[in-house]
Amino acid sequence: MGAIISRWKTKLTTVEQLENIDKEIKQLEEFRAKNQRLQKLWVGRLLLYSSALYLLISLFVYLLYLPEQWLLRLAMALPFFIYPVLVWFIRRFLIFLFSKRSERNNDKLEDLKATKKKILEEVMETETYKNAKAILERFDPDAKKKPELEATPVRPQMTPGAGQELRQRGVALRHMPMGTPVAVTPGARPPLGPGGTPVERVPLSAPGGPPERSGLAASVQMTPRSLGSPVPGVGMHPPGPPLARPVLPKDRGAVDRVIEYLVGDGPQNRYALICQQCFSHNGMALKEEFEYLAFRCAYCYFLNPARKMRPQAPRLPEFNFEKRLRAESSTPGPAPHSATDTEESAPPSRGMDKHGRA
């Protein structure tokens, strides 16, 4: 009969199970706090009442029932020495009882938390995204921190596009040399050129930039022109030097990923080139060339030196025909002699003297 009734019982849903577990956890936490309060209360009352009783009995005995003989005095004072020890043992016993209750309560609390964690893991695996998100936000204590983390702005990694618009950033503006500020009063008019046209001030390029760009900006700075007219020379070349290495795009296809896996290339196999002055991203270099690569920042034009000097291979000896002939001619050996040298060096015969006479 019980088996039949149990079949008709509806199984609790995940939300109901978590609600029951939360209720039990709340009750156990309240019981733990209540148990700690009771322990302090009972131990405090024990010490207070025992101390007050000890003082009252001591005064009462001393004033009314103190005998004159020393042996009787020692016998009557003996309970006053045993009483503090007895109170100390009672205090230890109370602390032991309350600590045991706290341990049992903590064990149940840990079991319930483990069960709750297991159910939440099953929810993340089995439930849909919408239901799982709602359950986690309701029952997971760490879910309150997730909106705060999502609300914090994350600086996206920017990739250079056509025309290199990314180089006109606030970093370059931060490092631009600023001239002396000119106080602008309301109603003041901009300076006029020779033809009566207003002159616009064009900011100079960043320090360390190409010299031709600085000269161009200086020449254009005080050139009289009308408002809205194009600046000569601007737009003819990109704002700064090109990136040292390209930045790999984020949205790569499956074919690109397969090729990167086969070749051994990709973002995980490259190192970012970060400027030491403005901390800007200047592309990604290969592992082999990262420590030996020197580059100029595309934003502040700072020259970043290489971390290491590239080792140079030993020079190979030169084997050519002329050097070989020179080496053979310089080696000592029997030199070929001519016929005249042979005749002059031959010794004179016995029948001839030094002057050729017989």
From Swiss-Prot:
Q: Where are the zinc fingers (C4-type)?
A: 275-300
Q: Which locations, inside or outside the cell, does it occupy?
A: Endoplasmic reticulum membrane
Coiled-coil segments on the chain, per record: 9-41, 99-128
Q: Which GO terms describe its molecular function?
A: identical protein binding; zinc ion binding
Residues on the membrane's Lumenal side span 67-69
Q: How does it sit in the membrane?
A: Multi-pass membrane protein
Q: How is it modified after translation?
A: Phosphorylated. Phosphorylation occurs during interphase. Phosphorylation also occurs during mitosis; these phosphorylations reduce both its homodimerization and the ER three-way tubular junction formation.
> Which GO CC terms are listed, alphabetically?
endoplasmic reticulum membrane; endoplasmic reticulum tubular network membrane
Q: Does the keyword Metal-binding apply?
A: yes
Oligomer and partners: Homodimer; homodimerization requires the C4-type zinc finger motif and decreases during mitosis in a phosphorylation-dependent manner.
Q: What is the recorded name of this protein?
A: Endoplasmic reticulum junction formation protein lunapark-B
Q: Which organism is it from?
A: Takifugu rubripes (Japanese pufferfish)
